[in-house]
């Protein structure tokens, strides 16, 4: 199961989807509150716990007891939450969110970052399809989240921008970040029993490794940590081959049943889109 980041949608995985689908059955949902996905309840707080509840419900609907999870940013945090609940056979966490601690200033910094990004995209939204035709424009537009935005196709670039502008929970989530709410950090990591690969992009400008990886490296049992050389926060576009290689190694190396998965439900995956 592939879990995208905040303000994105399932299509962010395009660079690696074909290779993964050729090897596995893949679930690539758009998460609640994001463009093309189910709604996020208006009366619920924006937290990793609530977002993970929604993914668990999807797993139950599909008859999936446990799965291999790949998550980027917010999706990486959700993948770790699912691992805590015993729903993961393995996890590949690409620049996972939630590794900061309340009071260290990172929540408000990230909230301000997304507020600026969305404001900029809203200003140019009407012309996104036209201006994203130029490689130089794509590199400039995505410089905060990837090193090589010019590698994104014009159609995908427009879709990424549209997803950010159309994210229904963006303002609520930004307010939660600015308020430094505890529900946006992840604790109790010692409950994780499955293999976890923590992949930290070398040039992450959203969740810089030196500030966001250390707690995960310390607290996730037997975590394997690697650095994604030459990559930014969304590494699937900067180096799709490297990310695919790491996923295949992690999944193929952990094909046994999850010890925590419900025994009465066969673990499987199902191809799914939005």
Name every feature range the model reports, one short phrase each.
Residues 88-126:
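Flexible "cap/lid" loop of the alpha/beta hydrolase fold
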């Amino acid at each position: 199961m592939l879990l995208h980041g905040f303000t994105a949608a399932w299509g962010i995985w395009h660079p690696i989807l074909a290779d993964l689908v050729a090897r596995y059955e893949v679930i690539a949902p758009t998460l609640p509150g994001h463009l093309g996905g189910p709604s996020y309840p208006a009366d619920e707080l924006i937290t990793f716990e609530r977002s993970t509840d929604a993914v668990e419900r999807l797993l139950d609907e599909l008859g999936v007891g446990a799965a291999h999870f790949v998550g980027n940013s917010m999706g990486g945090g959700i993948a770790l939450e699912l691992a805590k609940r015993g729903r993961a056979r393995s996890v590949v966490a690409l620049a996972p969110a939630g590794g900061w601690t309340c009071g260290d200033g990172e929540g408000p910094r990230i909230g301000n970052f997304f507020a600026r990004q969305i404001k900029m995209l809203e200003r140019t939204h009407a012309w996104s399809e036209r201006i994203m035709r130029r490689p130089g424009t794509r590199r400039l537009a995505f410089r905060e989240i990837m090193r090589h935005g010019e590698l994104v196709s014009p159609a995908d670039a427009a879709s990424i921008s549209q997803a950010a502008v159309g994210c229904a929970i963006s303002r609520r989530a930004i307010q939660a970040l600015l308020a430094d709410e505890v529900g946006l950090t992840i604790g109790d990591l010692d409950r994780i029993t499955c293999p976890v690969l923590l992949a930290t992009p070398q040039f992450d400008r959203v969740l810089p490794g030196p500030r966001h990886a250390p707690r995960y490296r310390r607290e996730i049992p037997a975590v394997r940590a690697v650095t994604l050389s030459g990559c930014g926060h969304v590494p699937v576009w900067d180096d799709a081959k490297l990310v695919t290689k790491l996923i295949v190694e992690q999944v193929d190396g952990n094909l046994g049943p999850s010890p925590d998965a419900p025994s009465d439900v066969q673990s499987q995956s199902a191809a799914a889109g939005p």
